[in-house]
UniProtKB/Swiss-Prot annotation:
A zinc finger (C2H2-type) spans 253-275, 281-303, 309-331, 337-359, 365-387, 393-415, 421-443, 449-471, 477-499, 505-527, 533-556. Expressed in immature and mature dendritic cells (DCs). Not detected in other blood cell types. This is Zinc finger protein 366. It is found in: Nucleus. One of its GO terms (cellular component) is nucleus.
Length: 744
């Protein structure tokens, strides 16, 4: 007996020495005997021991083989299950435990291990769940270190799971996810290659004696795809104290924090981990954490663009059924969340909170018809038009309607003749600032838009588009009074002013009124010292474009569409040959030839084409130069007579000589053309003789007119020359002229 007591004391001394050399393990991990096995290796290789130094891992004591108990099954040395935790025994009972071990030796039974001394803990019921099924793993392979960083959340203390004490695997100074590696998430890492980070073989649970969750057969994997993992387990014990009797045969387990119950212990454990701030399931795309795997699967649908739940009313899709049900409350009359100020109902609490905040700040924009709230006042006004129709703002002067008050305000400035924007170059006034900006480009000489047919350049793109319609030879708009046709509708509208007594355009300096804007613009040059129209053949400059045209005809012999002084044919010259001269004559500034009150008369020239005043003007405005009231040269007052240019007024005595020279040149050209036609057997010789006679008659009539006039005027001569022509002949000649120009 004394011999046996001595052996027990020796074992106690040996046990004390082993305890001093062994670190304290958490209560959830039990030491495992390693008799007959290779010594346990460090869980991390040499390359990774530096980053994982905070885990404070130390090798187990080397003399654990001296322990009298080993874990052996019946005839098998492989451990198949976790060791059962034993309640703590008092040190006085250790002798009895040792004696029992000796008796078990004698009977051939497997020995029980001696536990490390631990503080007293409450005893647990035999029906405890081992959370090895939800254990966490480390992926040791460096291939998984390329993942995305995951949001870190510290552990929150709770009544169920108190603040953890410092342990080798969960140190206090570090959060739950320590900064081991920027791509590594503790307690486990999710490979970025898989679409869903967790599968049925992600967790490798231990095999408890009575597993609560049945294990499914794992698929066979090759050695290349298997991942080497080291297990770090966390256990939460769920005993019968969580059980709640709800009646019937169904068992439910209730959370003591929020009193939420579950039919499965596993679901309750997952719920408790959520209270502690643990969300083990992470999204590989955005790094968002979730408590349950099903929540992660639902979240992954948002990244895949899949929304299986669709609203039948507005066809809006959602990823979850709960979101669809909450959305359907908007289409129903049931609004559970009501405003305490105005009583308006809302489907969501967030909408009610935002609505009440507007009441507090006084920024609510609520429709009085349907009660809808809008972020801005402009959106509310736009919405009111659906109930009341579009708001119309009527002009009290002309009964025009406008959609916006700003449009009506700009329109009223025209009736009041208010033009606040004045050009500093020419003094023209405008109602809108952008009109002044467009006009200023004419003074700068900027012409960026060019016609692709005739090469004429324009300042504005709209003017160029309007000009291109001239080349189409399509005049769809016709005046019902004079049967004149126009390319554009607005040109016809401006033409109709000619047939009325209204003269809306008035000069503010002299009070003279005009029925067209371009006539007023040309008149304004008379009050200024500017002479923008310059002759190409001499240094002469003119205020009006019409004066320049007359100067070119009289002084330099440049007739309509031709350069007779250069010996070119009349009216048959290709448009490309005269494009350079014509572009130089074209100016953006309009001209005024209607200051004297004259009747609209057709113009006829010796080449059989019609001349409409200034032929350098646009086609749709050429025919309107002489459409004014009748005029008599002798009866017109001196103040209203046409202002002639300096070349005609100062050198009027040389005008007949210049005209005689021009007539001689025309006769020579006509005789040459007649001789060519006869040599070729042309049957149109009679027409040439008629044109020759017409040229001689024109020259003779001009001489008679100059001899009877003290102050010769070329415009008066044109009036007497063409006063007997009819409008029908003018239109026919104009169509012939356009056909020649277009090569038809």
């Amino acid at each position: 007996m004394q011999k046996e007591m001595k052996m027990i004391k020796d074992e106690d001394v040996h046990f004390d020495l082993a305890v001093k050399k062994t670190p304290s393990f958490p209560h959830c991990l039990q030491p495992v005997a390693s008799r007959g096995k290779a010594p346990q290796r460090h869980p991390f290789p040499e390359a990774l021991r530096g980053p994982f130094s905070q885990f404070r891992y130390e090798p187990p004591p080397g003399d654990l083989d001296g322990f009298p108990g080993v874990f052996e099954g019946a005839g098998s040395r492989k451990r198949k299950s976790m060791p059962t935790k034993m309640p703590y025994n008092h040190p006085a009972e250790e002798v009895t435990l040792a004696l029992h071990s000796e008796e078990n030796k004698n009977h051939g039974l497997p020995n029980l291990p001696l536990l490390f001394p631990q503080p007293p803990r409450p005893k647990y019921d035999s029906q405890m769940i081992d959370l090895c099924n939800v254990g966490f793993q480390f992926y040791r392979s460096l291939e998984h270190f390329g993942g995305k960083p995951v949001k870190q959340e510290p552990i929150k203390p709770s009544a169920v799971w108190p603040q953890p004490t410092p342990t080798p695997f969960l140190p206090t100074p570090y959060p739950y996810y320590p900064k081991v590696h920027p791509g590594l998430m503790f307690p486990f890492f999710v490979p970025s290659s898989s679409p869903f980070p967790f599968s049925r073989h992600t967790f490798l649970p231990k095999q408890p004696p009575e597993p609560l969750l049945p294990r499914k057969a794992e698929p066979q994997e090759s050695e290349e795809t298997k991942q080497k993992v080291e297990r770090v387990d966390v256990n939460v014990q769920i005993d019968d104290s969580y059980y709640v009797d709800v009646g019937g045969s169904q068992k439910r387990w209730q959370c003591p924090t929020c009193e939420k119950s579950y039919t499965s212990k596993y679901n309750l454990v997952t719920h408790i981990l959520g209270h502690s701030g643990i969300k083990p399931h992470a999204c590989t795309h955005c790094g968002k954490l979730f408590k349950q795997l099903s929540h992660l699967h639902t979240h992954m649908l948002t990244h895949q663009g899949t929304r299986p739940h669709k609203c039948q009313v507005c066809h809006k899709a959602f990823t979850q059924t709960s979101h669809l049900k909450r959305h359907m409350m908007q289409h129903s009359e049931v609004k559970p969340h009501n405003c305490r100020v105005c009583g308006r109902g809302f489907a969501y609490p967030s909408e009610l909170k935002a609505h009440e905040a507007k009441h507090a700040s006084g920024r609510e924009n609520i429709c009085v018809e349907c009660g809808l709230d809008f972020p801005t006042l402009a959106q509310l006004k736009r919405h009111l038009t659906t109930h009341r129709g579009p708001i119309q703002y009527n002009c009290s002067e002309c009964d025009k309607t406008f959609q916006y008050p700003s449009q009506l305000q700009n329109h009223m400035m025209k009736h009041k003749d208010i033009r606040p924007y004045i050009c500093s170059e020419c003094g023209m006034e405008f109602v809108q600032p952008h009109h002044l900006k467009q006009h200023s480009l004419t003074h700068k000489g900027v012409k960026e838009h060019k016609c692709g047919i005739c090469g004429r350049e324009f300042t504005l793109l709209a003017n160029m588009k309007r000009h291109v319609l001239i080349h189409t030879n399509i005049r769809a708009y016709q005046c019902h009074l004079c049967y004149k046709s126009f390319v554009q509708k607005q040109t016809l509208k401006a033409h109709m002013i000619v047939h009325s007594d209204v003269k809306p355009f008035k000069c503010k300096l002299c009070g003279k009124e005009f029925n067209r804007m371009h006539n007023l613009m040309g008149h304004m040059h008379l009050h200024s010292d500017s002479k923008p129209f310059k002759c190409l053949y001499c240094p002469s400059k003119f205020t009006l474009k019409g004066n320049l045209t007359r100067h070119m005809k009289v002084k330099h012999g440049v007739m309509e569409r031709g350069l007779h002084s250069q010996g070119l044919g009349r009216g048959r010259i290709a448009l490309a040959q005269t494009a350079g001269v014509l572009r130089s004559l074209e100016q953006e500034e309009p001209f005024d030839l209607s200051q004297k009150r004259r009747a609209k008369v057709p113009v006829f020239q010796s080449d059989g084409e019609s001349a409409q005043g200034s032929h350098c003007h646009e086609e749709e405005e050429e025919d309107n130069c002489y459409e004014v009231e009748p005029y008599s040269p002798g009866l017109a007052p001196q103040s209203q007579q046409l202002c002639t240019p300096e070349d005609l007024s100062t050198k009027s005595e040389h005008a007949p000589e210049v005209l005689e020279e021009a007539c001689k040149e025309e006769k020579e050209d006509a005789s040459k053309g007649e001789w060519e036609k006869r040599s070729k057997g042309d049957l149109g010789a009679e027409g040439g003789q008629e044109r020759d006679c017409a040229g001689r008659d024109e020259c003779l009539s001009l001489r008679a007119f100059q001899s009877t006039r003290r102050g010769p005027s070329f415009s008066d001569y044109l009036y007497f020359k063409h006063r007997d022509e009819s409008l029908k002949e003018l239109l026919e000649r104009k169509m012939e002229k356009q056909a020649v120009l277009l090569g038809i």
